[in-house]
Amino acid sequence: FRAAQCGFGYRRSVFRENPGRYLVVSVTYRLAAGVRGTVAYAELRKALGKSAAAAPLTDVYSTVLDHRRAKSMVIEADNPNRRSVGYFFVNPVLEARELADLSNRARSAGFEDLPFHPVGENHFKVPAAWLIERAGFAKGSRHKSVGISDAHALALIHHGGGTSAELVEFARQIRREVLVRFGIELQPEPVFVGFPTANPLSAGQSTE
């Protein structure tokens, strides 16, 4: 595949749109010296300040690395949160009616600060981490040999000596509590390999 054939976009690619068809075993990058990247991510633009549009790639690289390190998304031997696949659940995108229902549920539970931002016409993205923490799963929570990262509630981590069944069991607990409290069914972001179904978090599915 050449780059154009991969269909890369924000959280999308030809590989993601054809689950089970492809297995990526190697990647080759062609880099160019002296170019400037497009800085579109809001937190990154804020960190770079007024110079974001003209920032050298070295500055962008350092800022991205600092940003990811703060969320324990950099593999470092001395970081206990390093064993993860990144963010485990997808941030739900809701229609206006669904957002209103979620806001009402949140207020009824005593939460007035439901965060969201628009993503296209009549659709809004809600942080899954916010839902997870307010469903009773704080950062640093633990279940057997797995748990939630101390740095970000969306990252499920492995403390060592555990099994994939323990991880799926814990993810199911989180998913169930968010659904009961907020009426939102979180969807997993990673691809599951070696399970009977594509989504072992669904009720009634085996964890083996």
Residue ranges and their predicted role:
Residues 2-165, 181-208:
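Phosphate/pyrophosphate- and phosphate-bearing ligand-binding catalytic cores of soluble enzymes
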